[in-house]
Regions:
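Calycin-type beta-barrel ligand-binding domains and close structural analogs
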Residues: 20-162
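Short N-terminal edge-element motif at the start of the domain
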Residues: 1-25
Length: 162
């Protein structure tokens, strides 16, 4: 969801399994940025002490309490984005530097997404940084999500996204 009190383009992302929806395994702030060459990237920010903001997708007061000081840019985790006929697709920058600690083990993230007017698909997989072997994530392919709500009316005009 948009975080209009932060820098333009700031979006709150919570990822949780349906059976533990109140305890997200990932909460981030994503911030798209147009580059001088016309390309688009999405900067990926961790949130310090993230449990404070769990449920922020549905709780306006929690969203409002997120401040720039709470954010830490995740080095190596920027998404490189391309426009497609259906919308956009992106993947984490190359180099195996987007490090993620999962179940007490370090891994590097390989992540891709496709975004359209009707939904999105995403796949996240972790790999061992020493062996490059798969250690976590989807085995059966991308997760597919249908769009059920729009928060476009929460995007402030001053963001000038068009």
């Amino acid at each position: 969801r948009p975080l209009p009190h932060l820098k333009p383009g700031s979006l709150l992302l919570e990822q949780a399994y349906a059976i533990t929806s109140k305890e997200p395994y990932r909460i981030r702030v994503l911030r798209p940025e147009g580059r001088a060459d016309g390309s688009l990237i999405i900067n990926n920010y961790a949130i310090r002490d993230p449990q404070r903001f769990w449920g922020g997708i549905e709780d306006q007061s929690k969203r409002d309490s997120i401040q720039e000081e709470d954010l830490a840019l995740l080095e190596g985790c920027t998404y490189l984005v391309s426009e497609t006929e259906q919308g956009f697709c992106g993947e984490v920058e190359p180099g195996c530097k987007c490090m993620v600690k999962r179940q007490g083990m370090n891994s590097y993230l390989v992540s891709q997404f496709e975004l359209s007017q009707t939904g999105m698909s995403t796949i996240d997989r972790g790999h061992n940084p020493e062996t490059n072997k798969y250690v976590w994530g989807s085995i059966a392919g991308a997760f597919k999500f249908d769009k059920t709500e729009s928060y476009a009316d929460e995007i402030p005009e001053q963001w000038n996204l068009r």
